[in-house]
């Protein structure tokens, strides 16, 4: 039976860095995959032309998702790196509406120890939205690693200790192709957000 898969990413680029290969694998398995972006990923960067850069980032996100095989990602447009300024209940309700509409069987989202505040709030909101209740469609929840956020977490947040691994050997190239849509996030090796580091983590 095909799965309904929901990716809840804090920002455009997190979906590729965190689970781009897994997304492509689900698509190859004929699963239904939806992607939700919680924050716009622009505001904290102090761009002068704010609206134009939001539009530009969305364009790149649409292209990246298309490369992975996902159509019509959802943009919730919470403020970048300021999701802690939004009442948590509002964030939870926005996710609950999407879950009610899409009835996902599998959800992927951030780890709770990530350094980035939006990642941690996204995790908290997703886990609250997925609390066990009668009639829930959700069977599995997976947390993914995002380079330069997960491994840079403070010790007080705990650490990411993965216990599930997926072979994406056949999908690493499409992951990199999608990542190249976010060129402003790619750095030179040995920075963790370099093509070489992303490939190394996938091995």
Each model region followed by its residue ranges:
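Flexible, glycine-rich phosphate/dinucleotide-binding loops
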Residues: 14, 42-44, 82, 150
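Cofactor-binding loop segments of dinucleotide-utilizing enzymes, especially the Rossmann-like FAD-
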Residues: 10, 38-40, 146
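Short, glycine-rich nucleotide/cofactor-binding loops
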Residues: 7-17
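Hydrophobic positions within alpha-helical membrane elements
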Residues: 18-19, 44, 123, 174
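Metal-dependent de-N-acetylase/amidase catalytic core
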Residues: 1-8, 25, 29, 49-52, ...
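Histidine-anchored nucleotide/phosphate-binding helix
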Residues: 17-39
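Short, surface-exposed acidic-centric catalytic microdomains
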Residues: 39, 43-71
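Short, conserved clusters of charged catalytic residues that mark active-site
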Residues: 17-18, 56, 90
């Amino acid at each position: 039976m095909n799965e309904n898969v929901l990716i809840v990413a804090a920002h455009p680029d997190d979906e590729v860095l965190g689970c781009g290969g897994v997304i492509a694998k689900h698509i190859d398995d004929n699963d239904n995959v939806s992607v939700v972006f919680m924050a716009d990923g622009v505001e904290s960067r102090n761009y002068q032309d704010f609206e134009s850069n939001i539009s530009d980032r969305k364009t790149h996100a649409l292209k990246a998702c298309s490369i992975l095989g996902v159509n019509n990602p959802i943009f919730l447009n919470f403020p970048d790196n300021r999701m802690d300024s939004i009442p948590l209940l509002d964030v939870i309700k926005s996710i609950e509406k999407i879950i009610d509409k899409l009835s996902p069987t599998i959800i992927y989202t951030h780890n709770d120890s990530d350094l980035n505040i939006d990642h941690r709030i996204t995790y908290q909101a997703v886990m609250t939205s997925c609390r066990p209740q009668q009639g829930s469609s959700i069977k599995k929840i997976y947390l993914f690693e995002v380079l330069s956020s997960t491994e840079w977490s403070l010790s007080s947040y705990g650490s990411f200790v993965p216990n599930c691994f997926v072979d994406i050997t056949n999908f690493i190239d499409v992951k990199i192709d999608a990542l190249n849509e976010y060129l402003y996030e790619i750095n030179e090796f040995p920075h963790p957000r370099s093509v070489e580091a992303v490939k190394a983590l996938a091995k």
